[in-house]
């Protein structure tokens, strides 16, 4: 069942740029939404080439950011 929606001119132009030959706007929207969904397991092993020093620095930096975030919350 088709539904009618209203989008801004800017949204229309952006969708038009993403649209491929033979693709409907519905197809574009579905492709873009599904393409942006990632599962946690998609990231498994992504940092496997990181050494211990780099890993420790990353987590220390993250802790600092989390502390700042908690203070501002």
Curated annotation (Swiss-Prot):
The keyword Membrane does not apply. Keywords: Toxin-antitoxin system. The keyword Cytoplasm does not apply. InterPro entries: Put_antitoxin. It comes from the Archaea. Belongs to the UPF0330 family. Possibly the antitoxin component of a type II toxin-antitoxin (TA) system. NCBIfam families: PRK13696.1-1. This is Putative antitoxin M1627_0365.
